[in-house]
UniProtKB/Swiss-Prot annotation:
This is Small ribosomal subunit protein uS19. Belongs to the universal ribosomal protein uS19 family. GO terms for cellular component: cytoplasm; small ribosomal subunit. InterPro entries: Ribosomal_uS19, Ribosomal_uS19_bac-type, Ribosomal_uS19_CS, Ribosomal_uS19_SF.
Amino acid sequence: MARSIKKGPFVDGHLAKKVEAAVASRDRKPIKTWSRRSTILPDFIGLTIAVHNGRQHVPVLISENMVGHKLGEFALTRTFKGHAADKKAKR
């Protein structure tokens, strides 16, 4: 179910403050955050945000195509190692 338009996009307050400060100072240093649930706004374009994936912070460079998506979509939490090899194929 999509979020109501009248509510607007959700962004954690502490992340919004960090983004405003980075834009004002033109700081290129990655912004570290644990807020995977925050929506990417047009203000974030060009910034690098380090999103926590449960183990480490994954740097995500925000582009125009990402606006409207959540930060967590770009920091994968699971590592796929591949399916088990077929035993018949080894013979």
